[in-house]
A protein has these predicted regions:
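Conserved phosphate-donor/acceptor-positioning beta-strand/loop module used by diverse small-molecule
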Residues: 328-347
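Divalent metal-dependent catalytic cores for phosphoryl transfer on phosphate-bearing substrates
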Residues: 59, 63-194
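Glycine-rich phosphate-binding P-loop
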Residues: 242-262
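Acidic/His-rich, divalent-metal-binding segments that scaffold phosphate/diphosphate chemistry
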Residues: 1-92
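Conserved substrate/cofactor phosphate-moiety recognition/catalytic segment
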Residues: 255-306, 342-345
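Active-site metal-coordination segments of metallo-dependent hydrolases
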Residues: 38-52, 93-107, 288, 311-314
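N-terminal pre-Walker A segment at the start of P-loop NTPase domains
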Residues: 202-238
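Conserved GTP-binding G-domain of TRAFAC-class P-loop NTPases and closely related GTPase folds
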Residues: 264, 342-383
Length: 383
């Protein structure tokens, strides 16, 4: 099934739900089984909530004035905006809750677009897929923007500028699309007003349609990590050198990229440490990680640039390493590699140490790409 088949088009803007459900019956069933009434008054389940929001979206002039590609991105994000509730909804003390449904929804939408629609392996497909995922992740931000405004102009400016910065790596993501999504899922007058204020603030400061510009990588990272309050100030680089952190699923060619681009750097490779101490990828990894961190600290104490070679597919894992590197005054460059689904599986099967395909699938399901906020330099490279 192609994406255009499920996205309403002019002149009638009709949504053919039957076509979509026939292509993804399990997803529709999961959404229909998940209760939503406690969260969205009139909707009995998540599927009804999603369909109602999509119908509202197609009637918005703001949606109809977008380009076809933008409409596809926003429409998919609108349908997926609460899909994370299928994984997180539970009853605690007689109340229904869905903690972190935005994060899990972003992961699930990325996984579905990657596996079902094969949106991987080119920058064009990555940008489309990640724009949808980012919209799902941040779908509640416009609805709650009134709370941000109460914190003052400086905080509201940082909020929109920091969010818009995602467009540096993901050009298809804009605050205009996030605002339009907000208008579609808003169910109260206050939420709609908050969305309008969000878009007005973004447009006033020049970030509605494009990401902000910064003097250089150091100044950008200082602002986004809140070490600098003024995004227009050039911040001096006080680091002694750069650590390269690799990221990407098994079989994306990290070793090959390293050999071609930085054979001169000493490397900490979790794969090599596993071989060294005879630990399988499916076994507990604490001994592997402990030895890797010990060697990293030695390089850092000696102010020796090095390369950290591992999958690094989650924000939590990366943050632990980034925190360590920052403690020693090092700058970091994150290099994320991606290839198509079929090519990634082929390369993994040809590895000396093959990672079981079910493990790779599990990793892809929970993969979170590094963002521009995480390090001084972040690169997406298609291989």
């Amino acid at each position: 099934m192609d994406i255009p088949l499920v996205v309403p088009m002019p002149p009638n803007w009709r949504i053919d739900w039957a076509v979509w459900e026939a292509a993804q019956p399990e997803l529709f069933a999961d959404m229909q089984r998940t209760v939503d009434a406690p969260f969205n008054g009139d909707a009995a389940h998540v599927l009804e909530n999603a369909q109602t929001a999509c119908e509202r979206l197609t009637g918005l002039s703001e949606f109809r004035s977008l380009t076809e590609r933008q409409r596809q991105i926003v429409f998919l994000a609108c349908f997926f905006h609460d899909v994370g509730k299928t994984l997180t909804t539970k009853r605690i003390k007689r109340q229904w809750v869905a903690p972190n449904h935005d994060l899990r929804g972003a992961e699930l939408s990325r996984y579905l677009l990657w596996t079902d629609y094969k949106l991987a392996g080119t920058m064009d497909m990555l940008s489309f897929r990640e724009a949808v995922s980012l919209l799902v992740l941040h779908h509640e931000t416009p609805l709650m923007f009134q709370d941000v405004l109460k914190q003052g102009d400086a905080e509201s400016l940082f909020s929109v500028k920091s969010l818009a910065a995602n467009g540096i790596l993901v050009p298809d993501f804009t605050l205009e699309l996030l605002g339009v999504l907000g208008l579609a899922i808003a169910t109260t007058v206050d939420e709609k007003e908050a969305c309008n204020r969000f878009m007005e603030t973004a447009e006033k400061n020049g970030y509605l349609h494009e990401p902000p510009k910064f003097a250089d990588d150091t100044s950008r990272f200082a602002f986004l990590s809140r070490r600098s309050n003024d995004s227009d100030v050039v911040v001096a680089d006080d680091t002694w050198g750069e650590i390269i952190m690799m990221a990407g699923l098994p079989g994306t060619g990290k070793d090959t990229w390293i050999g071609r681009n930085h054979p001169e750097l000493p490397m900490i490779s979790l794969d090599e440490i596993r071989k060294e101490i005879h630990v399988l990828p499916t076994e507990p990894q604490e001994p592997v990680v402990s030895l890797a961190y010990s060697r990293a600290r030695e390089f850092l104490r000696n102010k020796t640039p090095f390369l950290w070679n591992a999958t690094n597919i989650s924000t939590d894992i990366r943050n632990r390493q980034l925190s360590l590197f920052a403690q020693y005054g090092a700058a970091v460059r994150i290099v994320y590699l991606e290839t198509s689904v079929d090519e990634q599986y082929r390369r993994n099967r040809n590895r000396v140490a093959v990672v079981p395909e079910e493990a790779v699938t599990r990793m892809r399901r929970h993969l979170v790409l590094p963002t521009i906020h995480e390090a001084r330099r972040v690169e997406y490279i298609m291989v």
